[in-house]
Swiss-Prot record:
Name of this chain's protein: Large ribosomal subunit protein bL36c
Main localisation: plastid
Pfam families: Ribosomal_L36
SUPFAM superfamilies registered for this protein in UniProt: Ribosomal protein L36
Membership in a protein family: Belongs to the bacterial ribosomal protein bL36 family.
Statement: the UniProt record of this protein carries the keyword Ion transport: no
Subcellular location(s) per record: Plastid, Chloroplast
Assigned GO CC terms: chloroplast; ribonucleoprotein complex; ribosome
Length: 37
């Protein structure tokens, strides 16, 4: 899980979702997981 100021999709399978007022990226590839901090 990477904590970033700006989250973006890295590949085609990445999905932007909103959880507890935070933008997150979930993907089948664990390296692509991101959370906005």
């Amino acid at each position: 899980m990477k904590i970033r100021a700006s989250v973006r999709k890295i590949c085609e399978k990445c999905r932007l979702i909103r959880r507890r007022k935070r933008i997150m990226v979930i993907c089948f590839n664990p390296k692509h997981k991101q959370k906005q901090g």
